[in-house]
A protein has these predicted regions:
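Bacterial N-terminal signal peptides
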Residues: 35-45
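N-terminal periplasmic/intermembrane-space "pro-region" immediately following the signal or transit peptide
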Residues: 51-123, 136
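Outer membrane beta-barrel
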Residues: 93-130, 134-269, 286-301, 306, ...
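Sequence/structural signature of outer-membrane beta-barrel proteins
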Residues: 115, 176-182, 212-218, 229-231, ...
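N-terminal secretory signal peptides that target proteins for export/translocation
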Residues: 1-30
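Outer-membrane beta-barrel "beta-signal"
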Residues: 421, 446-458
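Detector for outer-membrane/organellar transmembrane beta-barrel domains
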Residues: 285, 292, 297-409, 413
Length: 458
């Protein structure tokens, strides 16, 4: 047995590839007998020690087996649940022809509304109308109704490694495109494109092509009562979505400054014919809209803020064939005061701004063909004490020069308060009260608007 043990010890040393030095060999020669003796004693003592130990009780082994079985069962259940979730996710995804994953999103929204005076639009009023029409007929003084035409739907895609950056694209549509003359009227609304964007983002810039909000006025108030037309339109909010090519270059400073520029399609904002459309007065200028903006951002996620200063310039052809300049200077901001309180808003000054969405209370040129000078703005405070509940209030005003519109709308002030709850499962409920006050040469007209919204998001 001793020979066998020593032989195995020598084989182990060779397998480990040890190459002892002369000094090490000398020391090993003197210590090898003692080491072998100790190893032999340990080998002989091990069986005795093992026999001296009492075997584990059968009950303890059974408990250990039951515990292992329970943990194995829970692991199998978790794996099965994960498989079901992955299968459901794969089934819910939309596979496009280009094999790019597309995500559907949207909001089904029912709005019940009440007005106590004549307004320009029943479910989303922008200003108060005069009690009588220009021909002298009495207007209906308020009413009660409901609609689902602020329902919206969209699709989004994202692809990595496109032109050295990341590509994001989306299409957003709603049913606020008006209605065909029919028995159903507002209950059978027309589909309308809101935004359609393709964006390539790099580390220090991005390029956008498609239909988007004006570069200089890219902030809207929070509301589930005024979605088809953003809140405070014709009362300080410039919003009209338009086709454009937009670029952003980050300057890499501590203030996270960025320079933005856009070339947009010209428009006066005038109503178009139902089917065949012609060029409007802005398109007749044969010049695009030019916009430039300098912005600064700070914070992340719930505490991210932004402030920007932008300039807008466009052209409109007047009745005598001359070109009238549309221009504006706009300051917009989203400022998180705390993690649950945010202040947002815009202020502007300019002229001939109907093409940006409600500027000049929808009045572009004077009777003499001169631009309507205008100034306005809005601000809203929004509080979100819980992830499922938020409330807030704000006001907006548009104030054209009285001498430019002596027979038109001289001033429009809108104040609104809202509360929105999302109890879970995508369900949402919102309540908004809005007071509108529009001033004419004959005096102010007022309307109280109450809107109850209910629906779900997906």
């Amino acid at each position: 047995m001793m020979r066998t043990f020593l032989s195995r010890a020598r084989d182990t040393g060779r397998d480990q590839g040890s190459v002892p030095t002369a000094a090490a060999t000398s020391r090993t020669g003197r210590t090898r007998p003692a080491a072998c003796a100790l190893a032999l004693a340990a080998a002989l003592a091990a069986p005795a020690a093992a026999r001296a130990q009492d075997p584990a009780p059968d009950s303890l082994r059974a408990a250990e087996l039951d515990s292992l079985r329970e943990r194995l069962r829970r692991a199998e259940d978790a794996i099965e649940l994960l498989r079901e979730q992955l299968a459901a996710q794969a089934a819910s995804g939309v596979q496009t022809r280009t094999r790019v994953r597309a995500d559907l999103f949207g909001r089904v929204l029912t709005n019940a509304f009440y007005n106590d005076a004549a307004v320009n639009n029943a479910d989303v009023p922008l200003f108060v109308a005069t009690p009588t029409t220009p021909s002298g007929e009495e207007r209906p003084q308020g009413g009660l109704g409901a609609s689902v035409r602020q329902t919206s739907v969209g699709v989004a895609v994202s692809v990595s490694h496109v032109l050295g950056g990341d590509f994001l694209g989306d299409l957003q549509a709603d049913f606020f495109g008006g209605q065909q003359p029919s028995t159903g009227g507002r209950n059978f609304p027309l589909l309308r494109v809101r935004k359609a964007r393709g964006i390539v983002r790099w580390a220090r810039g991005e390029l956008l092509a498609g239909q988007e909000s004006p570069l200089v006025a890219d902030v809207d108030p929070v509301s589930v009562a005024s979605v088809g037309t953003p809140g405070f339109t014709a009362a300080g909010n410039l919003w009209l979505w338009a086709p454009q090519l937009r670029g952003t270059l980050q300057l890499g400073t501590r203030a996270r400054l960025a320079v933005q520029g856009a070339v947009a399609a010209p428009t006066t904002g005038d109503p178009a014919a139902p089917f065949d459309t012609d060029v409007d007065a802005a398109e007749q200028s044969k010049r695009p809209v030019l916009q430039l903006r300098l912005r600064s951002r700070w914070g992340e996620d719930d505490t991210r803020g932004e402030i920007g200063v932008g300039a807008h310039r466009g052209w409109v052809r007047s009745a005598d064939g001359s070109l009238v300049t549309s221009e504006a200077l706009v300051v917009s901001a989203e400022v998180p005061l705390t993690r649950v309180v945010e202040l947002r808003g815009e202020v502007y000054t300019g002229q001939a701004l109907r093409g940006l969405g409600g500027g000049g209370i929808g009045q572009n040129l004077t009777a003499a063909g001169e631009p309507v000078r205008d100034r306005g703005g809005w601000a809203q405070l929004d509080v979100r004490p819980r992830s499922y509940f938020q409330f807030g209030a704000g006001c907006g005003v548009a104030d054209p020069e009285d001498e430019d519109v002596p027979a038109g709308r001289l001033r429009n002030v809108v104040c609104a308060a809202h509360a929105i709850a999302r109890p879970g499962g995508g369900v949402l409920v919102g309540l908004e009260f809005r007071r509108l006050r529009t001033t004419y040469a004959a005096g102010p007209e007022e309307n109280d608007h109450l809107n109850l919204a209910a629906g779900f998001e997906f």
